[in-house]
Curated annotation (Swiss-Prot):
This is Regulatory protein ViaA. One of its GO terms (cellular component) is cytosol. Gene3D superfamilies: von Willebrand factor, type A domain. Its main location: cytoplasm. It is found in: Cytoplasm. InterPro entries: Uncharacterised_CoxE, Uncharacterised_ViaA, VWF_A, vWFA_dom_sf. Transmembrane segments: none annotated. The keyword Membrane does not apply. It comes from Escherichia coli O7:K1 (strain IAI39 / ExPEC). Belongs to the ViaA family. Keywords: Chaperone, Cytoplasm.
């Protein structure tokens, strides 16, 4: 069976031009124009998808099969090209019958051309083949356009579904163009509207808890760039004005012992007029023990020093993936559960914006894992948000799972985050010592997001940072009142 790609090559039909026209028409459709205006960040993501569309269309045209009737007509045309004019005259009746039997668009015109000329000349032979070729090119082009139109409708339907999904989730998960691009890539899965509405629901809850959202942003930014002085700095002259004490008599600051006659206290001056005390006065004058007023002032002078020219390189601290462990015990149900899920959604938003990974582990009596930043991130997020917190608390297993994950090179420089109320039994000594070793040797950082004010200090002491979000009724009312 002849393929459409082979037919295009034989007839020199330019499929690239047809593909480009179809893509331009798709991007100019009213549905996409409205969407681009409403969500400009996603426009770049969709535009970046165009090469994939182009390649898919090429593959579709390459694998498409030509109808048997057209295949037979093309074969007949190729054989006719090899005939000389006398041979063509002999084969002409069979050619006309074949065209009629195949319902070729060229059949009627071919018969009219032959009937209009009583003699078949070499020029008529050439004209017949040229017009037949034009008819085949038109048929091949029409077939290409039909297939591309089918693909356009299918592609437009797919894009509209993804636009609906991305448009709903863009305000929740896309903080910049990078996040918008990753969100668009994730939207390729088969999702129903009721599924992703769960993400919308928790996104709205997160907006109602700005303190929780701000806490997630602070945790995400906890690794800031550090400035490091250069070692090859040159020396430069630095001038500054310094203030220092002076003897300029500006104000009385107290009393002192000295030989300053001009600032003698009246009682000291009185002893000079008493004969019996005159020698005592001179002795104290020589020894600078007379009581005098202490006057002080201040003066400014220019100080010149040499110091290195300060040039600093900013060492951007690596922001690795998030490994988030969520306590799903019964005490974490209700409002705590909503806050924990919304906090993970906020970390997912940060991970998408900063091109980081976000890995979720639910721990109770068993551990369930989700990766929210992978190609199936939206589906994974929906499955995570659908979980209910009704298990027990096994914090030790949580830490062991984190430490096992940190052994892999792909999780180098990860931030481990544990979300819990930390109302649990103390950690085993081997777990505590291993965590401290990871902190000391590999500089891994462990964050605690405490959902209760009653967490055990002995457990929380192991963390590098403790982010508190009290979910008690009093704290909730205070937060609402402050807004």
């Amino acid at each position: 069976m002849l393929t459409l790609d082979t037919l295009n090559v034989m007839l020199a039909v330019s499929e690239e031009g047809l593909i480009e026209e179809m893509i331009i028409a798709l991007l100019a459709s009213p549905q996409l124009a409205v969407f681009f205006e409403k969500f400009p960040r996603l426009k770049a993501a969709i535009t970046d998808d165009v090469p994939r569309w182009r390649e898919a269309l090429r593959s579709r045209l390459k694998d498409a099969r030509v109808p048997p009737e057209l295949t037979e007509e093309v074969m007949c045309y190729q054989q006719s090209q090899l005939l000389s004019t006398p041979q063509f005259i002999v084969q002409l009746p069979q050619i006309l019958d074949l065209l009629h039997r195949l319902n070729s668009p060229w059949a009627e015109q071919a018969r009219q051309l032959v009937d209009a000329n009583s003699t078949i000349t070499s020029a008529l032979h050439t004209l017949f083949l040229q017009r037949w070729r034009l008819s085949l090119i038109v048929q091949a082009t029409t077939l290409n356009q039909q297939l591309l139109e089918e693909e356009r409708e299918q592609l437009l339907s797919e894009v509209q579904e993804r636009m609906t999904l991305s448009g709903q989730l863009e305000p929740i998960l896309a903080d910049n163009n990078t996040a918008a691009g990753r969100l668009w890539d994730m939207s390729a899965g088969q999702l129903k509207r009721g599924d992703y509405q769960l993400i919308v629901k928790y996104g709205e809850f997160l907006n109602e808890q700005p303190e929780l959202k701000r806490l997630a942003e602070q945790l995400g930014r906890s690794r800031e760039a550090k400035s490091i002085p250069r070692n090859d700095a040159q020396m430069e002259t630095f001038r500054t004005m310094v203030r220092e004490p002076a003897t300029v008599p500006e104000q009385v600051d107290g009393l002192q012992q000295s030989d300053d006659i001009l600032r003698l206290l009246p009682p000291e001056l009185a002893t000079l007029g008493i004969t019996e005390l005159e020698y005592e006065f001179y002795r104290r004058l020589v020894e600078k023990q007379l009581l005098t007023y202490r006057l002080h002032g201040e003066s400014w002078r220019e100080k010149v020093i040499e110091r290195p020219v300060v040039h600093k390189d900013y060492d951007e601290q690596p922001r690795g993936p998030f490994i988030v462990c969520v306590d799903t015990s019964g005490s974490m149900g209700g409002f705590n559960e909503q806050c924990a899920k919304a906090f993970c959604l906020a970390l997912m938003r940060i991970a998408l914006a900063e091109n980081r990974r976000c890995y979720i582990m639910l721990f109770s009596t068993e551990i369930v894992r989700y990766e929210l930043s992978g190609p199936q991130g939206i589906e994974q997020a929906i499955r995570f948000l659908s979980q209910q917190f009704r298990g027990g608390t096994d914090l030790a297993s949580c830490f062991r799972a984190i430490m096992e994950r940190l052994q892999s090179r792909e999780w180098f420089d990860a931030d481990a985050v544990v979300i819990s109320d930390f109302i649990a039994q103390r950690l085993p000594d081997d777990v505590t010592s291993k965590v401290k070793e990871l902190q000391r040797v590999h500089q891994y950082r462990f964050h605690a997001v405490a959902m209760s004010a009653h967490g055990k200090p002995g457990i929380m002491r192991i963390f590098d940072h403790i982010w508190r979000f009290n979910t008690g009724m009093r704290s909730r009312l205070l937060r609402r009142w402050r807004r």
